[in-house]
């Protein structure tokens, strides 16, 4: 074999796809039943935070290349657009395995260890409903800032990596005699613990739920003059790549500080919504993506 043949694309693996394989290897630690349960949960959370950073930096960089019309292939023979398609396929597979690991392996193991997790507020018992409703009134409601979008109120930008709840609201327009549908959102407050201990129905068990489920159950209290059609959690990733030219920057530290501030408001790279979302809400998200998130 001639030495020059070693530069053939088939001899190389794309850097971004190789990174996804790395994150999958981290995920394999979460599936290892020989490890302590909370260590497995920690590895699962690491794969998720890794994926966030991957999208905000590496995927964002590829999108910038596509927008700039850059069509040169990488060492593995893939253009930026081809890489994005392959990344989408493989990350969907990775996320599927993440949730499969959580729901089929870790959650049952937690249950066996005496920790019951309620992921959907519809599953609350009457006693639990009473508790979370009071918890909402006392602790959550005072720190919420609901925001609705209509013709008179421009929608604010959603902060990077924040967890939010999107809702479709219905209000009958009596003048026009038709129903008006508005989109509203509320950020899940980071000042409160996301995991909330609630009364347990099983003796000797600890039961917990997620803060967003408490808000979702009580979201109608935020929009008293509307009917809430549906409400579901969502999260966005923004472009956090730092395009700094060290040679051109007069003050590198100042330039880095400027770019870090911009990271919260960069172009939207990824939108995450829960699997059981309403198709009507999903269609509304698609329609208003650029108006709301960009």
Per-range role (PLM):
Residues 2-280, 284:
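N-terminal non-catalytic structural scaffold regions of very large proteins
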Residues 281-294:
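Single conserved hydrophobic/aromatic residue that forms the stacking wall/gate
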């Amino acid at each position: 074999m001639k030495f020059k043949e070693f530069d053939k694309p088939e001899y190389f693996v794309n850097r971004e796809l190789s990174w996804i394989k790395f994150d999958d290897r981290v995920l394999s630690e979460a599936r290892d039943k020989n490890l302590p349960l909370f260590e497995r949960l920690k590895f699962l959370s690491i794969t998720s935070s890794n994926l966030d950073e991957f999208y905000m930096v590496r995927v964002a960089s590829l999108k910038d290349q596509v927008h700039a019309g850059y069509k040169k292939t990488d060492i593995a023979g893939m253009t930026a657009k081809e890489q994005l398609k392959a990344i989408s396929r493989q990350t969907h597979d990775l996320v599927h395995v993440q949730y499969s690991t959580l729901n089929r392996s870790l959650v049952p193991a937690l249950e066996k260890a005496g920790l019951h997790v309620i992921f959907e507020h519809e599953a609350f018992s009457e006693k639990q409903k009473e508790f979370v409703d009071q918890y909402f009134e006392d602790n959550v409601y005072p720190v919420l800032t609901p925001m609705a979008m209509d013709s008179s109120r421009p929608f604010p930008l959603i902060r990077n990596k924040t967890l939010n709840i999107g809702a479709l609201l219905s209000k009958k327009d009596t003048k026009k005699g038709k129903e008006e549908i508005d989109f509203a959102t509320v950020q899940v407050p980071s000042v409160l613990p996301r995991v909330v201990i609630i009364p347990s129905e099983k003796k000797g068990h600890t039961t917990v739920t997620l803060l967003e489920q408490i808000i979702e159950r009580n979201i109608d209290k935020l929009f008293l003059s509307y009917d809430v059609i549906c409400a579901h959690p969502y999260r966005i990733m923004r472009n956090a790549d730092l395009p700094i030219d060290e040679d051109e920057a007069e003050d590198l530290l100042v330039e880095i500080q400027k770019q870090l501030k911009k990271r919260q408001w960069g172009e939207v790279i990824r939108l995450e919504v829960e699997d059981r979302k309403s198709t009507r809400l999903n269609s509304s998200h698609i329609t208003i993506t650029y108006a709301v998130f960009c």
